[in-house]
């Protein structure tokens, strides 16, 4: 597909906003929520810029131009400085340390803890082959870890003298603000921050996830402002990234505005309905299907087949598991996803919300979805179990991931470190007469704050004195 040309805009006193979408997952936050249109309606001139793979997925908007940037590769300077930052800051985040290790290690244990001797030897050889392959693929990490090599690399980058800039189409548009939804500093984000500063364009990096500041990457050059999920993210930005706290705005996440707009009163449950337990899967390799079956088998034996429904909602993008286990209990109701090509994630529609709101207890590893369950006052249990197959089980990750520790440190949230312990906590919550729970997670995300859209628009208006 050819790049489409940027239309000539008539002279206007409206502030110009350029929104750069570099990932299809941002479609949920910026288009499906109506956020792009709301900014335009608030008195701004908005143009969306997207690379080819995202552009073809975007809906048409009658009054907002969408520009195809084609395919843009990041500069070598951006690639290396972002990676070097991960190494230099690794002492400030346990996730950074883990991420560096996992560039070489497989998700499964190299020497399996069960199976026949010959099977374990074959699995070990396969894992060692993967370690060697990972070492070749990530050989530059060795350079980043050795101080003299880092000095040579910095010298090389200075001699290379690569220009870091914004795409020409954005430069020609001459925006007052460049807003970049982001899941990390990788890709063209860092180049665009540098280029925008040179062009005296104010920048906002809108962080679109929970774990970016503690686990994704470092920003070698910081934007003028970040927007983040909550107050705890402000603290991470200050401690890990040396940000000025006043430049980190805890507006929330655009796709989470739904949790600020719905009523949070506890719904009175119809006692005639079956009780429902929902297990939410995790992307990392974890023997969760065995756990789901164990939960289903226990409650079927304890209460009979017709008293409690067990639902399993797998992660839409799960890593490959090494246990080879599949659900055997035919009573388990498994969520089937429709086409995920547009955003790689399920739509946050009524069906999605009902899955959470109709559950009596929600169980899962400490993920964003479990935070969402707590935002709608569902009773929750965190799965912190380990298994014999994977080094990435939720129980082990609770000690490795900085952002996960923010959740597991909250003592009021029930946890299960073993399958029996998990079942015990679930059963206790089912027998509890209350129909909801109020966990102290306002520091992670506060549902009482104004919606992200309102806060962002107010912020832009306050800093745009030449509005019509």
Question: Where on the chain are the PLM-derived regions?
Answer:
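Conserved catalytic-core segment of nucleotide-activated headgroup transferases in glycan assembly
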Residues: 31-37, 256-342
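Catalytic binding pocket for nucleotide-activated donors in carbohydrate/polymer assembly enzymes
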Residues: 220-223, 245, 368-444
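C-terminal alpha-helical cap of glycosyltransferases
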Residues: 448-468
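Donor nucleotide-activated moiety binding/catalytic core segment of transferases
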Residues: 170-171, 317-371, 376
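Short acidic-hydrophobic, aromatic-tinged amphipathic segments that line or gate anion-handling sites
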Residues: 67-71, 336-338, 342-344, 409-421
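Active-site and donor-binding regions of nucleotide-sugar-utilizing enzymes
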Residues: 16-261, 318-319, 370
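A short, charged/proline- and glycine-enriched loop
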Residues: 10-17, 173-174, 270-277
